UniProtKB/Swiss-Prot annotation:
Keywords: Antibiotic biosynthesis, ATP-binding, Kinase, Nucleotide-binding, Transferase. Pathway: Antibiotic biosynthesis; rifamycin B biosynthesis. It catalyses: kanosamine + ATP = D-kanosamine 6-phosphate + ADP + H(+). GO terms for biological process: antibiotic biosynthetic process. Pfam families: ROK. Inhibited by Zn(2+), Cu(2+), and Fe(2+). GO terms for molecular function: ATP binding; kinase activity; phosphotransferase activity, alcohol group as acceptor. Involved in the biosynthesis of 3-amino-5-hydroxybenzoate (AHBA), a compound that then serves as the starter unit for the assembly of a polyketide during the biosynthesis of rifamycin B and other ansamycin antibiotics. Catalyzes only the phosphorylation of kanosamine to yield kanosamine 6-phosphate. Belongs to the ROK (NagC/XylR) family. Its EC number is 2.7.1.179. This is Kanosamine kinase. The gene is rifN.
Length: 303
């Protein structure tokens, strides 16, 4: 019998990515974009179709499947909230996944937690804070090589840490969450207000390269908030470094040095600012983490 096949799935608000590994070798990597939003049933049918085609290509049963989820999944296996696709609320994820992969051991976890796990393994750093900036803000904390608070014990929701009392309303219903101030859409909204005209992602990239003041000010509003959140985590658990990734951050290299500068401003006497680096895996952190989760569940390390 050959080396078992493990599948990682990164479920996003706009697309779903898949990676099949055998040992350390990548067998297949593919993705699809969600169709028009109608119902969770339509989404699950689209997912099932892609899985069926993937199975045909690899031609080998799967030993284990790990799934990175952006929404909140309750202990009963049902989706409690997913702001990007609210029609998934109440979906029995556990049953749906076992129907798709009846022969495999299956587990799921927060996409930010899995991103942190993958980055920890890729960098060789056992104590790190990972922040993924995209449509929202996810993140994860790894201490001693283990995700914190722990798989199955809830997610590390740094995107919903409050950094500005009475600030902008977040999709979660509170005000002043990091996500409401520093996510990709939040940064673009601030940039549009400062410029006095709509700003796209590519327009912001170009303006930052050209040193346009409105672009720099828009980004600083986000990186100040990020530095405040990171400082709070540093005071509590003392990670060795911060890695910043996600699709939005991957294309704006100015984020990392800006956060680093504000962290230096916030440091207390006798305390060193945390090193800030770009995520080693870029926008693939959660997908690689999902594959790692499949390996853990296959080894019996995840119930």
């Amino acid at each position: 019998m050959g080396t078992p096949y493990h599948l990682g799935i990164d479920v996003g608000g706009t697309k779903v990515a898949f990676r099949v590994e055998s040992g350390s070798a990548c067998i297949e990597e593919t993705s699809f974009s969600w169709g028009a939003r109608h119902s969770a049933e339509d989404d699950l049918a689209q997912l099932a179709g892609h899985v069926a085609r993937l199975r045909e290509r690899i031609g080998t049963p799967l030993e284990a499947v790990g799934v990175a989820m952006p929404g909140t999944v309750g202990a009963d296996g049902r989706v409690a909230t997913w702001p990007s696709r609210p029609e998934w609320t109440g979906v029995d994820l556990k049953t749906a996944l076992h129907s798709l992969f009846p022969e495999a051991a299956v587990a799921w976890a927060d996409d930010g937690d899995l991103g942190a796990l993958a980055e920890s393994r890729a960098s060789g750093c056992e104590n790190l804070l990972y922040i993924g900036i995209g449509t929202g803000i996810g993140g994860g904390l790894v201490l001693g090589g283990v995700p914190c608070p722990g798989l199955g014990r809830g997610s590390f929701e740094i995107g919903h840490v409050i950094v500005e009392m009475g600030g902008v309303r977040c999709v979660c219903g509170r005000r002043g969450c990091l996500q409401a101030l520093a996510s990709g859409p939040a940064t673009l909204r601030r940039a549009s207000l400062l410029r006095g005209a709509d700003v796209t992602y590519y327009r912001l990239q170009r303006a930052l390269r050209n040193g346009e003041p409105w672009a720099a000010d828009a980004l600083e509003g986000s990186t100040r908030a990020l530095a405040a959140a990171v400082t709070g985590v540093q005071e509590l658990v003392h990670p060795d470094r911060v890695l910043i990734g996600g699709g939005f951050a991957a294309g704006i290299p100015e984020i990392v040095p800006s956060v680093s500068g504000f962290l230096a401003d916030l440091v207390r006497q006798g305390q060193a600012p945390l090193p800030v680096e770009p995520a080693a895996l870029g926008g693939l952190s959660s997908l690689r983490g999902a594959v790692a989760l499949a390996g853990l569940v296959a080894a019996g390390e995840v119930p």
